Amino acid sequence: MILGQTLYEIFKNSFVMVLLLFASIAALTLIIERWWYFAKNRLSSKWVKEFFSYLRNGDWEGARRYAAGLKSPLGRLFLLGLENRNLAPDELSNLFYGQILEERIKYERYLGGMGTLANGATLLGLLGTVVGLIKAFHNIAITGSGGPAVVSRGIAEALLTTAFGLFIGIPTLFFYNYFTKKASDISLELEGIGERLIVALYAHRQETPKEETRREERKEYWQF
């Protein structure tokens, strides 16, 4: 019971509350979906170290298999670099820029809708309050009766929609800002990893046959 009314009566008497209910369901759905996507497509420094260890040993096939097994934006960036490692650094940088932009779009998917729901829920709550106040004063004018207690009750019922709208809007806005910042941070991290990969690939291309032979000998020595 809220203000002497059941939830059914509250939603039955206010179309704005019904709209807010649907908004809350939509917002919760988007938050859960984005949380799952970010968790599934996270970045790990362990993966970066492991991949670059393959490059240091000159194990291209091992690096390719490892990158393909990641099934993440990091793995897709690594594969793109390996498949185009013979390109000039500037060309490879442009490829990485396009790939990272594509990944960022995926991370930011549905965030526009989440932001709209956060602001829309608050405004809907205010609309419900205004409509409720109009109805309360209109009923008082028609009946010709109503003391402070009656007016206060009508205002309290009208303000309920504002409270519900804020209850939806504030958490949704928090998650919107969190996911937006997270998407930006991941994009910057991918850019940094991409730069490191370009340097590593270019360094391997500059090795002379004699240097490659010495590296193979060192690898065999340590394996022994």
What are these regions (language model features)?
Residues S14, L28, A63, F78, ...:
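Residue-level signature of catalytic and energy-coupling elements of molecular machines
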